[in-house]
Amino acid sequence: MGVIINESKSVKWEGKVEIADNFIKRAFGFMLRNPGHALIFILPFETRFNATIHGFFMLKSIDVIFLDSEKTVVDVTTLRPWRIYVPKKAAKYVIEGPVGLRKVLKVEVGDKVEWIT
């Protein structure tokens, strides 16, 4: 179990939190898996290109939160299967989770987000 915290609004989401900190975990993400937990991608560089995500082979839509190196939200979206999304600004961290994650966290651009695994 883990927790994702919107420190700007003092709200949290509790559930399984997995860190995708290597190429294989980042490459597969939620492909062919049910997004019932949160997956946090730690990217090697803070760029828009590295933070681009896709929904290829995904079974369901997911909520996605993009954070810069200071863990400040720079973009938020809901990604549908078979779509590609490029964040509006460079990101160092990407949080993927079930649809509703962004609503529970009340997350908006500019919020500070932290997690505990």
From Swiss-Prot:
Pfam family, one: DUF192
Lineage, broadest ranks: Archaea, Methanobacteriati, Methanobacteriota, Thermococci, Thermococcales
NCBIfam families linked to this entry: PRK03760.1 (NF002996)
Source superkingdom: Archaea
Family statement: Belongs to the UPF0127 family.
Gene3D superfamilies documented for this protein: Protein of unknown function DUF192 (2.60.120.1140)
Protein's recorded name: UPF0127 protein PYRAB11210
InterPro entries (alphabetical): DUF192, Saro_0823-like_sf, UPF0127
